[in-house]
């Protein structure tokens, strides 16, 4: 859908070339030579990425946002990349995988999470979270909101999701 709307494109550069184009916090980035690739060509390449026709790193799907944004995360971020390794659960079903910044908002939206609570290091990611949601949101559904907070460390209390899950799975607590 994003490719059809002209809001994403398949980039065929190396990860090093993409990184070099990002610019710096004080200098805008430069556009990929593939940024204006025809929609039909990007759709065809993306289908081939999904089918496993390419090696890891040959192509990525990037959002088409702005290479001059003051927020470097908004400079045409990678959304999907090819990974040619079996997944622990789905094995070889999938050949492409989404990047965290895309998946974060998308999964919150699908699961109808109203508020995504994140620690402060995610504050720069909020613009991207909101941009992604703007592309997929259905006005009749809940639109998630990302909110950041300072990390809270409590003494003698477990708050880590991983540690809590381990306690539940180990049968030490229920929940």
PLM features per residue range, with description:
Residues 165:
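A C-terminal cap/extension of S-adenosyl-L-methionine-dependent methyltransferases
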Residues 1-146, 153-159:
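Active-site cores that bind ATP or allylic diphosphates and position pyrophosphate for catalysis
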Residues 161, 169-175:
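Short, intrinsically disordered, charge-balanced linker/junction segments flanking boundaries
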